[in-house]
Amino acid sequence: MKPVVVLDTNILLDVLVFDDSRAHPLRAALMAGSLDAVATQKTLAEFLDVIGRQQFLLSQEKQDQIMFQWRSWSRLINDEVLDIAPWKCKDRDDQVFINLAYTLKPAMLISKDKMVLKIAKRAQKDGVVITSDHNRVFSDDFSLKTAEL
């Protein structure tokens, strides 16, 4: 069974826009289809909004290519079927990522958002690993935890 992975917007920027070397193994796994990367319309809309911002200087064509790539790697889940996680994030825009990981647990949410990372200990008790480490999904401890759940 492939590990279920939710990637927040900042991690997607590392993978698809910034070409961050720390994200290269994650990108390779996404390209190989060895992860069950999941998204919703709301998470796609947020990512599209962010990459469309002036600071990134991405042409419409480049934005379309990036979105096409992410959609080809990810499985789309309907926002309407998401369970509400018992932990709340102060940043309401990030709650959808938390709810998505909670719905599909055991799952990993990779995020650099400090508000999201604050709930990591509580989430882990319910089968959701929250980490800022791009490559924790490849660690033995994550594989063992998901196998136990």
Mark where each language-model region is.
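Hydrophobic/aromatic ligand-binding patch that stacks against planar heteroaromatic rings
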Residues: 29, 100, 119
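Metal-dependent nucleic-acid phosphoesterase active-site entry motif
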Residues: 1-20
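Acidic, PIN/NYN-like endoribonuclease modules and their adjacent C-terminal/linker elements
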Residues: 87, 104-108, 114-149
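Membrane interface segments of multi-pass transport proteins and intramembrane proteases
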Residues: 56-59
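Acidic catalytic patch
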Residues: 42, 64-88
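PIN/NYN-family metal-dependent endoribonuclease catalytic core
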Residues: 6-7, 23-54
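Acidic, metal-associated active-site segment
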Residues: 91-108
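Short secondary-structure boundary segments
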Residues: 9, 41, 112-114
